[in-house]
Amino acid sequence: MSEAPRIQLLSPRLANQIAAGEVVERPASVAKELLENSLDAGARRIDVEVEQGGVKLLRVRDDGRGIPADDLPLALARHATSKIRELEDLERVMSLGFRGEALASISSVARLTMTSRTADAGEAWQVETEGRDMQPRVQPAAHPVGTSVEVRDLFFNTPARRKFLRAEKTEFDHLQEVIKRLALARFDVAFHLRHNGKTIFALHEARDELARARRVGAVCGQAFLEQALPIEVERNGLHLWGWVGLPTFSRSQPDLQYFYVNGRMVRDKLVAHAVRQAYRDVLYNGRHPTFVLFFEVDPAVVDVNVHPTKHEVRFRDSRMVHDFLYGTLHRALGEVRPDDQLAPPGATSLTEPRPTGAAAGEFGPQGEMRLAESVLESPAARVGWSGGASSSGASSGYSAYTRPEAPPSLAEAGGAYKAYFAPLPAGEAPAALPESAQDIPPLGYALAQLKGIYILAENAHGLVLVDMHAAHERITYERLKVAMASEGLRGQPLLVPESIAVSEREADCAEEHSGWFQRLGFELQRLGPETLAIRQIPALLKQAEATQLVRDVIADLLEYGTSDRIQAHLNELLGTMACHGAVRANRRLTLPEMNALLRDMEITERSGQCNHGRPTWTQLGLDELDKLFLRGR
């Protein structure tokens, strides 16, 4: 029998190389650590030079505070940092780095040269080290105030790691993405990037709102900026601002999603869940939203020391953060109207949501979301178009489409859709557009119907095409949600209660949220440490698999502190009702009926998409029409 191996300390070199496996995955990982150090040093300009995707050379130069000569060797030691001193400092840390591991890890797998000079030093000093040589060499050098870090031959001494690197272009794309993320996080810093001697981009400082918008356009593309809604909301010590893409600007991959917590780029499942909920019924299946959002909160209530790469965070009150993010984004998307989508880029802004009663995201006494968390203000509260015309329709010629003060019941909203197409009074559909663009509603006036499916309309920008079934489906769907919110959810007691075997933790969760379940029409009773009984379910969900639904909801509550599964099931049912209740294809509409539908779209939330996420209308501008006919060439 062989002798058991003895426990022994790892050599510093091996320990650093093991640590490098967590911190240094590829050149982009090196760039992230070096750039964060530059930002923490107060840099106002950062130059990045790359060769062969960052494998052969990665040089980061900044104009920050610099490092004193005596501290240069220490900067390459493990767990050496200037950013925290005590454990209490970690609870309120605002710097991007604080572990003191990055430079030691990088120097263990590459040839590293660091040159730095402080403002009060007469000369710069340089330190060199290689993976095999853990004793840094310090010598004088020429360098302006600031720091340069040069990393050559990444993974030269760990060939097993090097062979996992991708092609040069792939590695450079990852590295460039890191710089873009940091460029969005710090508008006050200039970033310059060169690859193989060629300038890739030069981003100047962005101090004012217009300059910030330009940088967002440069990083994310001008198309995003033109299809994004600026938002800024602050409440209860939580501050969210940035840009959210309209549902019409979705992507097949989640590659245009930037979320920052106190200036730190994070990818958090709680944030992803809140955003997914907010876009739930306006995105087509398989599409992903786009956003650049900045979330600012007291550092004491967020833990950034969760993962070595610091990509994950943990919030002290995750439920409140989730509900704030969801409610803010849901309201912002709900308040988009056709005139917002036709406005010039950056013209629309949500500074504070309008009061919406039992609206999405409104907080109850204990910070819980109220019952109608996915229902926004009733369209019945906004009669006529808000473009400055008379609500009576006498002067505008299109605003005579009125509604009752009280929201309709579920039965009325689902079955009386024909009443929504009551013709306008004679003479109210103008034969031609008014001369003044101020008098033209966003979706214009109907011209004709195409194949019984599409409405052709003319507005101030050109031609509008509307899918009448999809548009009316959304209108009916929103009314059904409002009706359900006003009536409440009626429960249906089960003749024979269903028993569920759960874990003790799940049973505790269900008991803790019993009031929340009851407001949604469920009645749960705990029969034992690991047994629940379902005694009542929502009447609308009597055909649903109640046992599995309750299990899924409890799993969500344990994971995120909230759940939208019940609401999603209800919305799916309402969506089916709306689909069957909407005007069908091949039904001929009169011009007044078509205009009534257009006016209704202009005051209905999320009218740009049906509840399946398909677009309901599109605009063909005069310039696009001119291109089709080669006019002006």
Swiss-Prot record:
Name the InterPro entries for this protein.
DNA_mismatch_repair_CS, DNA_mismatch_repair_MutL, DNA_mismatch_S5_2-like, HATPase_C_sf, MutL/Mlh/PMS, MutL/Mlh/Pms-like, MutL_C, MutL_C_dimsub
Q: Which GO terms describe its molecular function?
A: ATP binding; ATP hydrolysis activity; ATP-dependent DNA damage sensor activity; mismatched DNA binding
Bias kind Low complexity: ranges? 388-401
Q: Cite a GO CC annotation.
A: mismatch repair complex
GO terms under biological process? mismatch repair
| Gene3D superfamilies recorded | 3.30.230.10, Histidine kinase-like ATPase, C-terminal domain (3.30.565.10), MutL, C-terminal domain, dimerisation subdomain (3.30.1540.20), MutL, C-terminal domain, regulatory subdomain (3.30.1370.100)
Which residue positions does the secretion signal occupy? none
Q: What are the coiled-coil residue ranges? A: none
SUPFAM superfamilies linked to this entry: ATPase domain of HSP90 chaperone/DNA topoisomerase II/histidine kinase, DNA mismatch repair protein MutL, Ribosomal protein S5 domain 2-like
Ordered alphabetically, the record's keywords are:
DNA damage, DNA repair
* Region of interest (Disordered), residue spans: 336-364, 384-405
**Which SMART domains does this one have?**
DNA_mis_repair, MutL_C
What CDD domains does the annotation carry? HATPase_MutL-MLH-PMS-like, MutL_Trans_MutL
Name the domain of life this protein comes from. Answer: Bacteria
Question: Is DNA repair among this UniProt entry's keywords?
Answer: yes
Q: Which HAMAP family match?
A: DNA_mis_repair (MF_00149)
Instruction: Give the protein's biological function.
Output: This protein is involved in the repair of mismatches in DNA. It is required for dam-dependent methyl-directed DNA mismatch repair. May act as a 'molecular matchmaker', a protein that promotes the formation of a stable complex between two or more DNA-binding proteins in an ATP-dependent manner without itself being part of a final effector complex.
Q: Which family does it belong to?
A: Belongs to the DNA mismatch repair MutL/HexB family.
Q: What is this protein called?
A: DNA mismatch repair protein MutL
